[in-house]
Curated annotation (Swiss-Prot):
Species, as recorded: Arabidopsis thaliana (Mouse-ear cress)
Lineage: Eukaryota, Viridiplantae, Streptophyta, Embryophyta, Tracheophyta
Record keywords, A-Z: Activator, DNA-binding, Nucleus, Phosphoprotein, Phytochrome signaling pathway, Transcription, Transcription regulation, Ubl conjugation
Positions of the UniProt region annotated as Interaction with COP1: 23-36
Post-translational modification: Ubiquitinated by COP1. Ubiquitination takes place in darkness and leads to its subsequent degradation, thereby preventing the activation of photomorphogenesis signals.
Phosphoserine modifications at: S24
Gene: HYH
Region (Disordered): 1-77
Protein name: Transcription factor HY5-like
Length: 149
C-alpha cells in the first residue's frame, strides 16, 4: 500500500501540469490543503519498505513522530512556502486593487471639492460686487442734509 507524495513523479502529475496551464487565474489561486496527505505519505511509504525503521518503531511505542517531523519534511516545507507565496501574491494584488479604487475615489472627491470651491468663490465675488453697488446706490439716494439750515 504505497501512496504517492504530493509532487511525486507519475504520469498523472505530468498530465495535471498540462491541465494546470489551461486553468483560469481563479483556479490557479486556489491551493488544496495537502499538509495531512504529505505527512501520511511519508509514514506509509516507509512502512512498505519492510526495513526496521526507527521512526516506525517509535510510532508503535506511542511516541508520535509524524507531528514532530511534519514541519521538517522538505516536501511539506516546499508546499507551505509555495502556498504562503501564493497567498502573499493574491493579498498584494488585492491591496493594489483596493489602493487604485481608493486613489480614484480621492481624485474624484478632490475634483468635486475644487469645482464646488470655484463656484463658491465666484458667488463671493458676485455678492461682493452687488454689495458695493447697493452701498453706492444707498449713498446716492439719501437726501442731502444742509448744514446751513
Amino acid at each position: 500500500m504505497s501512496l504517492q507524495r504530493p509532487n511525486g513523479n507519475s504520469s498523472s502529475s505530468s498530465s495535471h501540469k498540462k491541465h494546470k496551464t489551461e486553468e483560469s487565474d481563479e483556479e490557479l489561486l486556489m491551493v488544496p490543503d495537502m499538509e495531512a496527505a504529505g505527512s501520511t505519505c511519508v509514514l506509509s511509504s516507509s512502512a512498505d519498505d519492510g526495513v526496521n525503521n526507527p521512526e516506525l518503531d517509535q510510532t508503535q511505542n506511542g511516541v508520535s513522530t509524524a507531528k514532530r517531523r511534519r514541519g521538517r519534511n522538505p516536501v511539506d516545507k516546499e508546499y507551505r512556502s509555495l502556498k504562503r507565496l501564493l497567498r502573499n501574491r493574491v493579498s498584494a494584488q488585492q491591496a493594489r486593487e483596493r489602493k487604485k479604487v481608493y486613489v480614484s475615489d480621492l481624485e474624484s472627491r478632490a475634483n468635486e471639492l475644487q469645482n464646488n470651491n470655484d463656484q463658491l468663490e465666484e458667488k463671493i465675488s458676485t455678492l461682493t460686487n452687488e454689495n458695493t453697488m447697493l452701498r453706492k446706490m444707498l449713498i446716492n439716494t439719501r437726501p442731502k442734509t444742509d448744514d446751513n439750515h
